[in-house]
């Protein structure tokens, strides 16, 4: 499904509008990013989490609204593309998925403590 090429953001703060978005589809529509519903059905939370990771070091509030909107769009496209070529299991953006492949810690119990 392809959203319009122009974002559907209303006049005002892009960050506030994205905070009010109720679904991943709304993020894509607001920012004017095309998406495949099949990909979004499987990886919606992963894509949005990755978008947040990419934006974590940026101060969107300090940017002019048009620049912030363009930056959000570019980052959402980048996050979405991450999941076009790999799966959420490959990307492991959530802690539970990272922990699943982390080496298991062995616990050492000294023999003296077993008396």
From Swiss-Prot:
What keywords appear on the UniProt entry? Nitrogen fixation
Is Cytoplasm included in the keywords of this UniProt record? no
Enumerate the InterPro entries for this protein: NifW (IPR004893)
One BP annotation, GO:
nitrogen fixation
**Lineage: superkingdom:** Bacteria
Q: Does the keyword Kinase apply?
A: no
Quaternary data = Homotrimer; associates with NifD.
Q: Which family does it belong to?
A: Belongs to the NifW family.
Please give the function described in this protein's UniProt entry.
Answer: May protect the nitrogenase Fe-Mo protein from oxidative damage.
What HAMAP family does the entry give? NifW
User: Under what name is this protein listed?
Assistant: Nitrogenase-stabilizing/protective protein NifW
Q: Native species of this protein?
A: Rhodopseudomonas palustris (strain BisB18)
């Amino acid at each position: 499904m392809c959203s319009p090429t122009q974002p559907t953001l209303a006049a005002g703060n892009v960050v506030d509008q994205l905070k009010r978005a109720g679904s991943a589809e709304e993020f894509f529509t607001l920012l004017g990013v095309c998406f495949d519903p099949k990909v979004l059905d499987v990886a919606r939370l992963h894509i949005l989490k990755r978008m947040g990771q990419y934006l974590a070091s940026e101060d969107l509030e300090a940017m002019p609204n048009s620049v912030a909107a363009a930056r959000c769009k570019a980052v959402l496209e980048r996050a979405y593309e991450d999941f076009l070529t790999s799966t959420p299991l490959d990307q492991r953006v959530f802690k539970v998925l990272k922990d699943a492949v982390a080496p298991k810690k062995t616990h050492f119990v000294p023999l003296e403590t077993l008396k």
